[in-house]
Amino acid sequence: MVKRVAIVGAGVSGLASIKCCLEEGLEPTCFERSCDLGGLWRFTEHVEEGRASLYNSVVSNSSKEMSCYSDFPFPEDYPNFVPNSLFLEYLQLYATQFNLLRCIYFNTKVCSITKRPDFAVSGQWEVVTVCQGKQSSDTFDAVMVCTGFLTNPHLPLDSFPGIQTFKGQYFHSRQYKHPDVFKDKRVLVVGMGNSGTDIAVEASHLAKKVFLSTTGGAWVISRVFDSGYPWDMIFMTRFQNMLRNLLPTPVVSWLISKKMNSWFNHVNYGVAPEDRTQLREPVLNDELPGRIITGKVLIKPSIKEVKENSVVFNNTPKEEPIDVIVFATGYSFAFPFLDESIVKVEDGQASLYKYIFPAHLPKPTLAVIGLIKPLGSMIPTGETQARWVVQVLKGATTLPPPSVMMKEVNERKKNKHSGFGLCYCKALQSDYITYIDDLLTSINAKPDLRAMLLTDPRLALSIFFGPCTPYHFRLTGPGKWEGARKAILTQWDRTVNVTKTRTVQETPSTFETLLKLFSFLALLVAVFFIFL
């Protein structure tokens, strides 16, 4: 019988795991190696070992309605995309609201997690920690690892011939904090993920010249999408997700390409992804095309050679003088406190069932939360994982035999997506809505839209055609939240009200009213045929 649960890390997934354990009568003990909660979202001027690091200007890429905990919306006065300082404040509010701090031991490093001698029977773990030089050991019935994957920088210097001769400065993007370091310098940023693009844009305001080197390109979108709404509230809907999964791949690729190029022509700007047949994680940046068109950022192909004070790019013999190189080349994940046999990692891929449970263990009492890259927000993903894990630990949900789980893991590895950047953890990518629904189905928490269409059609239509906000995940099942329905039906109000800081008189026309009525009727007909 699982009772005591050790949780490693007090970031967004660790906090959710504590709350899920408490709600189901388990006894969580969370070990956080730093002095406070927040993980990635707690900015510090200096990089801390073993903790994710962010730069001072970081703003969330997911909007507040899409990236909140499923039963705890962001405060209404928060902007739609949240700066890191406010994001940390939100996490502190969450921890206070649900009394989570009492379960956290700060400044406590987990040294090792090993199986107890009777693990085959008990499934228990021995957890060794150290706090202020004092080592302790304790036994737990289960472990939830919530350390993320943004702590071990991937810096493949062997891939850049001549880097040892470079006399300028170079560092991984993990070390970046402020743009002052680029003042009056010639800067090269390697890697066109979110961090690399952000850093290149920031550098372009102070540097003499900025180059952004990319191997595979990327779709670049703004946080501000159709009609000024947040991109993910328009893009991440169950209806669109259904179309993306049902339509032929060439059709989906064409539609995505057309949509992505509606802001600017990616080919003309030199950033178009080489492989446009798959839906891949877009790069979120509101400024990049403006910096490119004004000559402040120059897009370049991969590096051919690094020299003492310059760089030669592929497909061009010209040497470009460079003072600073920033390697935004991603991260690798590791669990230094676990034996390699517990979480098996091969070719950058972890053998985790549903990205969570080590598939080979005879007892499913160790889970990894947040080791996934969904095309969606991390908070509701990690929270849903934690809810599912707790139900497994309680015995309310059962897992398949290890052989079946290993088969699914191996199939996933074969069908892995391709990602952005030089080192993107490909095996961690997942379709957000499909993945969440799969976990919710296992714990009987997925909303039944067919039944809801008869009992609450307004809510059903909002869920199917509207943004897939986390509140969907609390309408039913264990952890049901009574405020979920209201949160869904008022989500657009909260989105718009925060930007309406000046009242403008609207004058709707009769034509617009009739058009809306006709559209609504057409929508009802479409829904009727979809759910037949």
From Swiss-Prot:
List of residues binding FAD: G9, A10, G11, V12, S13, E32, L40, W41, N61, S62
Binding of NADP(+), residues? S60, N61, S195, G196, T197, D198
Q: Which domain of life is it from?
A: Eukaryota
Q: What is its main location?
A: endoplasmic reticulum
Name used for this protein in its record: Flavin-containing monooxygenase 1
Identify the gene encoding this protein: Fmo1
This enzyme catalyses: hypotaurine + NADPH + O2 + H(+) = taurine + NADP(+) + H2O; hypotaurine + NADH + O2 + H(+) = taurine + NAD(+) + H2O; trimethylamine + NADPH + O2 = trimethylamine N-oxide + NADP(+) + H2O; N,N-dimethylaniline + NADPH + O2 + H(+) = N,N-dimethylaniline N-oxide + NADP(+) + H2O
Expressed in which tissues: Expressed in liver, lung and kidney and to a lesser extent in the heart and brain.
